[in-house]
């Protein structure tokens, strides 16, 4: 698949199935991520790979967060608790702000966003699908703290990863 076809044909599948990429495949994906534009070579992007038992740990964190929401319904609480199990692997996108006179915080976030796009395009080229999720679970200080992130670190989203599932449903853009 050439680069332009990869860009034009990538979409987010609604159905996420096993398997996840191998460790060797993920090393290539991370190399591609780090080729994203990075003003002043600050390296603001890092990635937490969640799979296997890690999905349960992330589920526990999401459920703990849900319990802090006043008057949360059981349905929404279960939705948060089950969110990590939608795919066999999740990459948590972390942006680390570093003080720099010429590189404001927004440019550092844009670098991490570009890294995320490189991740998704790399996975697509390897016949995997990726869905970038944000919402209340991203940009969330409670979850960041429970993941052990520092004050200058922020979650920019979660990339859910699975085998590229080919069906009419997979062709729908999410």
Listing of model-derived features with the role each one plays in the protein:
Residues 48-50, 91-94:
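Short, conserved beta-strand edge motifs with alternating hydrophobic and charged residues
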Residues 6, 90-92, 158-160:
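Conserved hydrophobic/aromatic beta-strand scaffold that supports enzyme active sites
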Residues 149-164:
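A glycine-rich helix N-cap at a beta->alpha junction
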Residues 52, 142-143, 149:
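Short Asp/Glu-rich motifs
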Residues 88-90, 129, 154-156:
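Structural motif
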